[in-house]
Swiss-Prot record:
Comp. bias intervals (Basic and acidic residues): 92-111, 148-165, 283-294
UniProt biased composition (Basic residues): 218-227
GO biological process: chromatin organization; DNA repair; regulation of transcription by RNA polymerase II
Biased composition, class Acidic residues, residue ranges: 74-91, 166-210
Keywords: Chromatin regulator, DNA damage, DNA repair, Nucleus, Transcription, Transcription regulation
UniProt organism field: Debaryomyces hansenii (strain ATCC 36239 / CBS 767 / BCRC 21394 / JCM 1990 / NBRC 0083 / IGC 2968) (Yeast)
Keyword Transcription regulation appears in the UniProt entry: yes
Higher taxonomy: Eukaryota, Fungi, Dikarya, Ascomycota, Saccharomycotina
Subunit structure: Component of the NuA4 histone acetyltransferase complex.
Record's subcellular location: Nucleus
Keyword NADP included in the entry's annotation: no
The protein's name: Chromatin modification-related protein EAF7
Gene that specifies this protein: EAF7
Length: 323
């Protein structure tokens, strides 16, 4: 009961003032009694008349109910001991040692005063440039990333150049293929012009063999051998040898209708020019060249006789295929 009566009643203003003083004067460590006496004096300055003044016991009780004072003292004593040991040993700072070394060197070499200043500047710059290991690793990672980016860019450019070379080679091959196709088409056109004579010879051969002018079916190699065997057995005369090549005999089994009959039976229909018209055949080109030559002859006949007549140049054969 006596302790409860001895407990001081703290107002809000008193607690705020105590916390402010705690920040300025910490009652812990070796100087906790000295700091507490200052806090008591500051607290009693604002006490009104008729109120009980603050004592050290009142403040310690208040702080003991809020903090673990023993733990605070242990931590504060440990910090104070480190500071005291450093002061007792009198260990100079690293900067002071560097300054002393620079002074000693300058005293030994009077002419090297400028060099000592340069060395101190270099030492300070080195200290500034020193970076922890984590930072150096980060810089190394950034460098590696940059190197990788440069490598990827070089690889991409190399791949692009290779693709361009491949496309150029393909284009050249396609151009060569187009030229070869054009030559084959021209050769086929010439063969088409020569085919009517071959067809006429085939028709004549067929008429001679039949004796009646009727068209017989072309015979394959197997059938021809079979006919030879039958003729050997029966004694009938063998058929005449065909003049056509074996490749054409193998490729075509049935003869196409002769072009003579096609020309006589059905006249060629007039072709209307369209946007997607096929290229003209060489026969049509020759007809157009013949028409042009006739017009030239008619014009030459109109020229007066005084002008000397020049020999007619043969018509130039031009291919209508676009190259």
């Amino acid at each position: 009961m006596d302790e409860e009566n001895d407990m001081r009643e703290w107002s809000l203003d008193d607690e705020i003032l105590l916390f402010d003083l705690m920040c300025d004067f910490k009652p812990a460590g070796h100087d906790k009694d000295k700091q507490m006496s200052i806090i008591v004096e500051k607290m009693n300055e604002n006490v009104s008349e008729g109120t009980k003044p603050f004592s050290a016991d009142d403040i310690w009780k208040k702080l003991g109910g809020m903090y673990d004072l023993e733990r605070v003292d242990e931590l504060e004593d440990y910090i104070d001991e480190d500071e005291d040991s450093a002061e007792e040993d009198g260990a100079p700072n690293e900067k002071e040692e560097d300054k002393k070394e620079d002074i000693d060197q300058s005293s030994k070499d009077p002419d090297s005063s400028g060099l000592s200043d340069v060395e101190t500047d270099m030492a300070s710059e080195r200290e500034e440039l020193e970076v922890p290991k984590s930072g150096s690793r980060g810089n190394n990672k950034n460098k590696k990333d940059r190197v990788r980016k440069v490598d990827t860019k070089e690889d991409s450019t190399a791949v692009e150049t290779k693709d361009a070379e491949v496309t150029n080679e393909n284009e050249d091959a396609n151009d060569d293929g187009d030229d070869n196709n054009e030559e084959e088409d021209e050769g086929n056109d010439e063969n088409e012009q020569e085919d009517p004579d071959d067809d006429d010879q085939d028709d004549d051969d067929d008429e001679n063999e039949s004796g009646e002018g009727s068209l017989q079916k072309r015979v394959t190699r197997g059938a021809r051998k079979h006919q030879h065997e039958l003729s050997d057995q029966t004694g009938t005369p063998k058929p005449k040898k065909r003049t056509r090549s074996s490749a054409k005999l193998d490729a075509v089994e049935t003869p196409p209708p002769s072009k003579r009959s096609q020309k006589t039976a059905t006249p060629p229909a007039q072709q209307t020019p369209t946007a997607s018209a096929k290229r003209r055949k060489k026969s049509e080109v020759q007809e157009s060249d013949a028409d042009k030559s006739n017009t030239r002859r008619s014009k030459r006949s109109l020229v007066p006789a005084t002008t000397p007549s020049k020999p007619q140049a043969p018509p130039i054969r031009r291919s209508s295929r676009k190259k």
